[in-house]
Amino acid sequence: MQFPMGPACIFLRKGIAEKQRERPLGQDELDELREAFLEFDKDQDGFISYKDLGNLMRTMGYMPTEMELTELGQQIRMNLGGRVDFEDFVELMTPKLLAETAGMIGVQEMRDAFKEFDANGDGEITLAELQQAMQRLLGEKLTPREIAEVVQEADINGDGTVDFEEFVKMMSR
């Protein structure tokens, strides 16, 4: 099916989720969507910015192209005021969630992987934690320089650690 504005528009057509569904989302799927949404709703106001949408979609296992994100961003700014609430997010994600259920990495799996690296559970992976995890999980002893390079590449905000959002971005590359 072709849409005049490109493939990402499947998310934005009015009522498309209803037409595309072969089945309704199960409670587990809705719970996973809500959990992922809340993870990115940093100020807990019930909205995420269109800028966070790409990261959130990656958390859900869908790897949008830059073109899709650009199209979604343009549409969200025009149609949804630049912010997405949970209901809009469910409508955006339902077709993809149903189409790509097989083989997806869900938020729980991503969080479990993060916890393997975040030894002290403070929500941040430090250089020392990464070095220990690499040795424990992969049997690889990386040099301090190699560990620093990995963290530097993933550390978007420059605080010297890798938080969950940065971990998701790193894992989706």
From Swiss-Prot:
Chain residues that bind Ca(2+) 2: 118, 120, 122, 124, 129
What GO molecular function annotation could you give as one example from this UniProt entry? calcium ion binding
Domain of life, per UniProt, equals Eukaryota
Tissues with expression: Expressed in inner and outer plexiform layers of the retina, and retinal bipolar cells (at protein level). Expressed in the inner hair cells (IHC) of the cochlea.
Query: Which InterPro entries does UniProt cross-reference here?
Result: CaBP1/2/4/5, EF-hand-dom_pair, EF_Hand_1_Ca_BS, EF_hand_dom
> Pfam families, alphabetically?
EF-hand_7
Q: What happens when the gene is disrupted?
A: No morphologic changes, but 50% reduction of the sensitivity of retinal ganglion cell light responses.
Protein keywords? Calcium, Cytoplasm, Metal-binding, Repeat
- Name where it mostly resides: cytoplasm
| Residues annotated for Ca(2+) 1 binding in this entry | 41, 43, 45, 52
Q: Which CDD domains match?
A: EFh (cd00051)
The GO cellular component terms are: cytosol
Residue positions annotated to bind Ca(2+) 3 are 155, 157, 159, 161, 166
User: Which Gene3D superfamilies does the annotation name?
Assistant: EF-hand
Cellular compartments annotated = Cytoplasm
Q: What are the residue boundaries of the EF-hand domain, all occurrences included? A: 28-63, 82-99, 105-140, 142-173
Question: Subunit arrangement?
Answer: Interacts with CACNA1C (via C-terminal CDB motif) in a calcium-dependent manner. Interacts with STXBP1. Interacts with MYO6.
Task: Give the protein's function.
Answer: Inhibits calcium-dependent inactivation of L-type calcium channel and shifts voltage dependence of activation to more depolarized membrane potentials. Involved in the transmission of light signals. May positively regulate neurotransmitter vesicle endocytosis and exocytosis in a salt-dependent manner. May play a role in the extension and network organization of neurites.
- Spell out the protein name for this chain: Calcium-binding protein 5
